[in-house]
């Protein structure tokens, strides 16, 4: 019954972890979709046209088109009549306009609705233009198409990147189940020998084990998945499918591992010494070959990730996982776990030899037991390496990718507050009463066939409001009325320009002679990789030399000092000449892919720690049952309870501490080498490449590892209680086959 209880707990925990992670991912995606559509009020589309002679037929036609465009997507369409020119230009009491407002129903929207919603908004515009709905024209206004398209793209990126933590968790779960079931099979070897000795065939024993394991695994999977579903329901509910998928995967995994472990143990009994030696050499060869294959796969995957610089590729504007690069973190951590197991035996024997020279025997005996029971202690070592490694890798992603996304947001906006200007008005800048600078944007600039975005401003003022270090000297006009500019590395690569090169640039409808005066990592106000920065004064003089004038600035950038940016934005909105004001968000958007993927990493880290505690507990208590006779013998030889408990705890803690240190070191190296590629998956193609500085988030990983350490301490305490109970039991009799 004890072994069945371990198998039941294993099935329940694995099912709970997998169902919880999959269900939480589905819940977060649905929540992100709903919040993305309602972050600034519910996104919607407006159909505006003059009211037809027969309004009922017109309304029926519009609703039929809406239904054909959006299909099963839950949207609500309302109609009203507008006769106020302040609402719609041209409307009047004599000739009112009909308006249909289409909004998604947030309570029913799921992540799967975003793509059809975006396509429907695009199709709506096309179908209305070719229909007879409009009376002297029809307009489709609103931000539904733009918002839904951006949200669908962000969630697609998050899903493509989520295969990284999903792969880590899959490796952890598979190894935990396979190692623990193998340990259980070893524990039941005596019982297997008894059944074979009484005439049972190997097939009958295997079938009985599978039936027994199937019933236990089914009960455990249902219990674990049910508990996960109940917990997730408290936070708002999730679809049943992901939860059931976690339970089904657990059942298949447990049965498969039980079958493999059973077949392996059935081949062992009844063989002579020569066969056993041959089998041992074969296992060693298989282990070495597996290690070499995994090392080769990890090397290829890492090389692919370093070569392409990301774990996703773009196929027609759609993110697709690069499966080889995506597998790199999981394969490297798996390799680290296997290397740790390979080192565990030699290090244990070395520790035994060193400790034998000391006075006490407890440490030496503990090291000897680890060296002699590597099959059991390998479970604890692998589980600990993967748990600590996954947690620190998740901490590295959490500390690197979201800050990179925030830097891109800041770079796109340019400044904390950006006002779009309809016309030049010096009063706007003076009334802002904040550090501000006018900015000229020209996204249609070109150098020969190469298209680019040009930004011009007073460079010191731009540096002050954007917070970026910008090159000096762009305001100094070189001889010959050449325009000094700073270019991005990508633009330099595409045009072949280097420092001091002169070239012709099409800028503000004029061809100007420019010179590369500096290189700049990125240009404030755009994330485009092809970008150029110029000083507004130098640009004005260059245009005047060609008989042209610098047009009015397109934007005013502000960096409020001692004032909330939203208050500064509200004040700007009422000023003449201002068409729109944008405040750069300081928090991640609801559909920010880096935030969603970081959450997946945290779930994988939590799941790996739970599975590690289960694996270590299984090692401790199955070993306690298998070595009960050893406890009685040592007690008869004079070993007191305290020394035996200390020795057994030292065995377990020695393995766990070694594996934790090894996993932490491997994960740190992985973060330093590959985190730039993992974090860069959130960067869209054509976006400027910013340097990535890997940083490990310390808060939640520290708390999680502290809980892990506490649970290991509790396990050792419980193990000590079990051993003391065995010593007090005076009726123990070793069973013999």
Language-model regions, residue ranges each:
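Interfacial "coupling" helices/loops that link adjacent transmembrane helices in transporter permeases
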Residues: 1, 175-214, 614-657, 731
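Short, strongly hydrophobic transmembrane alpha-helices
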Residues: 2-27, 290-303, 375-400, 657-661
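Short cytosolic juxtamembrane segments of multi-pass membrane proteins
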Residues: 268-281, 724-737
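Short helix-loop junctions at transmembrane helix boundaries
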Residues: 222-245, 304-324, 661-707, 717-730
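Hydrophobic alpha-helical transmembrane segments that constitute the membrane-spanning cores
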Residues: 168, 212-236, 516, 607-620, ...
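Juxtamembrane segments of multi-pass membrane proteins
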Residues: 308-491, 499-502
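Mid-to-C-terminal secondary-structure elements
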Residues: 459-468, 492-529
